[in-house]
Structures are given as structure tokens and as C-alpha cells.
């Protein structure tokens, strides 16, 4: 059996949902890369009794390694190190070298705040220099050091802010106590494929068929997830079972060649960015109000190919900013394929681009009709050679869902237009 680990995410702000937990998923991925089985991720507030209860629960599960995040600050409710020390049966001790290091960091940070007494802040942060006897100290990225406490299980204590936790991870893994705890880890491969336009029920049917026809299928650990209207299929397996994974991938290719758009885990955003190299793109958006333009510019370097965009929410804006004929809108309605094509053509001309994408739809909750219910969205991709790729989709969900899914549909339509997929 592979080495097993558990994660304890602490913080009342995380427990109550005011702050999203980014550490649990990130740490889970890192453990997976190491070949360590993740047994549990638990969330608890800042109460010492609750933190200790999570530690004892994971220890009772027989995990080899526990990783905690959060509760390492200088305030009264930052109690994780003290709780872990008690759980591991160790005394807290002041580390003079660490105290000096934290003082230097605080002094440097306080230089930006001349009205604040650095000595008072250093005194408040002195608490962070107390560590369990025999623990390995992980150098702080902010003011909070991490610690590795050897034992059964070994406990790694990391800060809560991801910008401090993530740079500390490699040092934590390199600690002798952690290497001993995960010595029985198994080397796994993990592959991700992505599909668009296939319902989950269709994928489930294919996987049921694969169960009976792909040799070694039972040794594949398959996880499926619907994200932004796309299906993500993550498969983990031991290297010796590569043939089984190849068999599954071949079946997915045979049955869903049109829907399968990524075999290496690449996102459609990555693919579109690559396809836009050497081109310029403009956007014309109504119901999404700039969400597509924002998504296109999420990638560093997007200024090389994004020319600009227009949010033409009203009919007058479609006419004044994009040159859409008012009579066309009157004849077909603002949410129609002819208007989407006219918007895309207008964006091409306005920005001098060679590629344009237009979105016009009814995001709801009102505005729908029997002929065009809420969720009706029209898309058009226009190329400088006069080619148009135009579609109408009926998208499920609330207003936010429809708007977000619209950007995904537009990205895939753009991918198909630029790759010649049609």
C-alpha cells in the first residue's frame, strides 16, 4: 500500500466560506505528484480543541503524514503550532535564531510604515519563534515559519496564505522526517483529457463499455468532472498499466472524436492562445458584457493578438458601435444569428482584426419568450476571408451560469474556426 496523508485546513474564515480554500486542492495535487495517497481533507475553525480533534481523527485513520495550513500568525487565535506541539507530545521552545530572522523581516516590512513602532510589532511576532522541541524549521516567506515535527504520523505545519505556503513546500518535502513518512509511496502517472459537447451520461455509457472491453480497466483510477460545460477526465495509474490507459484513450477517440479536444490536459484557452499566434482578434459582446474579452486576456502575452472589444448591450450600441443595421435587428431580433454575424463583422472592421467573435443572448432571469427562452445564445466567429462560423445554443442554469457557459461555447467555436474543424 502506498504512503497515506491527510490535510487539515484551519481558519474560521475558511470554515464559514468567507475565504475560499486554495491550499487543500493545491496540496492534494502535490501529494498526488509524489505518489502519496490522500486519505482526507478536513476543515476546521481556529478553536484548539477542533484542530486537535482533526489531528487525532487522521492519526486514527493510520495516515503516515499530516499537513496543516493556517494558524501561524502572531495573533491570539493563531494556535496551530501550539496544538500540534501538544498533539506530538513536545514542548514549545523559543528558537533565538528564528526570533532574530523574524525580527529582521518585520523591520524590513515596517520600513514602509514610518508611523508604526517596529519594536512593538517585533514583540507581537515573537510568538512565531516558538517551535516544538526537535522540529525542523522551514524558513518563513512572510513572517510565519513552517515546521516539520517527526513522529507517527509526521506533521508538517504550513502557513495559510498560499503565497507563503507554496514556496515552502519543496523544503518541507525534502525534510528527512517527511521522506521517511512517505518512503512507501507508489509512482503513479496521471493523464487528463478534456471533452466538449458530450453529456456526462454519454461518457458514463462509454466507461461502462470500457469496463468490459479494455484489459486492465479495473486498475485505472478515473475521476470525471464537469467544468465550465467541459468534461474533464483524469486517470491515474501505475506505469505498468499504461496499456490499459492507452486502450481507454483509443476508445474515447473512436467514440467521441469530435468532442475530444485535448489529450494532454491543455485547456481550450491554451489552445486558442496558440492558434491566435500571428493573428489579431476582436470581440463583440452583448449578454456576456466583456467576459469573453477578459478570458482572452487572462493569458500573459495576450496583447500580441487581442486588438480590443466592444460591449454592445443595447440595440443602439450594436448599431452605433458595430454598424449593425437597425432593420436587421427589427427583422430578426437582437438575439439571432444574422445579428451575431453582423456584430462579428462590425468588430472586424472597427478594430482592423482578422478574427472576431460575437455573442448575443438572453441570460435571464427575464426577457425570454416561447420562441427564444432564457438561455438562448447566438454566437458567430468571423474571419477576414469572409468565413463565418455561427451557432445558436440553449444553455442551462441561472444568469451567471449562462454567461459563463457562453464564454466557453465561444472559445470552442473559435478553436474550431481557427483549426479548420468547423
From Swiss-Prot:
Pfam families: CinA, MoCF_biosynth
HAMAP family: CinA_B (MF_00226_B)
Protein family (similarity comment): Belongs to the CinA family.
Record-given protein name: CinA-like protein
Organism per entry: Mycolicibacterium gilvum (strain PYR-GCK) (Mycobacterium gilvum (strain PYR-GCK))
Amino acid at each position: 500500500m502506498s504512503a497515506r496523508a491527510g490535510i487539515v485546513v484551519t481558519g474560521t474564515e475558511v470554515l464559514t466560506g468567507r475565504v475560499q480554500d486554495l491550499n487543500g486542492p493545491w496540496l492534494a495535487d502535490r501529494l498526488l505528484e509524489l505518489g502519496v495517497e490522500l486519505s482526507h481533507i478536513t476543515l476546521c475553525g481556529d478553536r484548539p480543541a477542533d484542530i486537535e480533534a482533526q489531528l487525532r481523527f487522521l492519526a486514527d485513520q493510520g495516515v503516515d503524514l499530516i499537513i496543516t495550513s493556517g494558524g501561524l500568525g502572531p495573533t491570539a487565535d493563531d494556535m496551530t503550532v501550539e496544538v500540534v506541539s501538544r498533539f506530538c507530545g513536545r514542548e514549545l521552545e523559543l528558537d533565538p535564531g528564528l526570533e532574530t530572522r523574524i525580527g529582521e523581516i518585520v523591520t524590513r516590512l515596517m520600513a514602509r510604515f514610518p508611523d508604526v513602532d517596529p519594536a512593538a510589532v517585533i514583540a507581537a511576532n515573537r510568538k512565531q519563534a516558538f517551535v516544538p522541541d526537535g522540529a525542523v524549521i522551514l524558513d518563513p516567506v512572510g513572517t510565519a515559519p513552517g515546521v516539520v515535527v517527526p513522529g507517527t504520523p509526521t506533521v508538517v505545519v504550513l502557513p495559510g496564505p498560499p503565497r507563503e505556503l507554496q514556496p515552502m513546500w519543496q523544503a518541507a518535502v525534502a525534510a528527512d522526517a517527511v521522506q521517511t513518512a512517505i518512503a512507501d509511496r507508489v509512482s503513479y502517472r496521471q493523464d487528463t483529457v478534456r471533452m466538449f459537447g458530450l453529456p456526462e451520461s454519454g461518457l458514463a455509457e462509454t466507461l461502462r463499455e470500457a469496463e468490459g472491453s479494455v484489459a486492465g480497466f479495473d486498475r485505472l483510477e478515473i475521476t470525471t468532472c464537469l467544468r465550465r460545460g467541459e468534461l474533464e477526465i483524469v486517470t491515474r495509474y501505475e506505469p505498468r498499466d499504461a496499456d490499459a490507459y492507452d486502450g481507454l484513450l483509443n476508445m474515447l477517440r473512436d467514440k467521441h472524436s469530435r468532442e475530444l479536444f485535448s489529450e494532454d490536459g491543455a485547456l481550450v484557452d491554451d489552445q486558442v492562445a496558440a492558434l491566435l499566434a500571428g493573428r489579431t482578434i476582436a470581440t463583440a459582446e452583448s449578454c456576456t458584457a466583456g467576459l469573453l474579452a477578459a478570458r482572452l486576456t487572462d493569458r500573459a502575452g495576450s496583447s500580441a493578438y487581442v486588438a480590443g472589444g466592444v460591449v454592445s448591450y443595447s440595440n443602439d450600441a450594436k448599431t452605433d458601435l458595430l454598424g449593425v443595421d437597425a432593420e436587421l435587428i427589427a427583422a430578426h431580433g437582437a438575439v439571432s444569428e444574422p445579428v451575431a454575424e453582423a456584430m462579428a463583422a462590425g468588430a472586424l472592421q472597427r478594430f482592423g482584426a482578422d478574427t472576431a467573435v460575437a455573442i448575443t443572448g438572453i441570460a435571464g432571469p427575464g426577457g425570454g419568450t416561447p420562441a427564444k427562452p432564457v438561455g438562448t445564445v447566438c454566437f458567430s466567429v468571423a474571419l477576414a476571408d469572409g468565413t463565418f462560423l455561427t451557432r445558436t445554443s440553449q444553455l442551462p442554469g441561472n444568469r451567471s451560469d449562462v454567461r459563463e457557459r457562453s464564454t466557453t461555447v465561444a472559445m470552442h467555436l473559435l478553436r474550431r474556426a481557427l483549426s479548420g474543424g468547423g
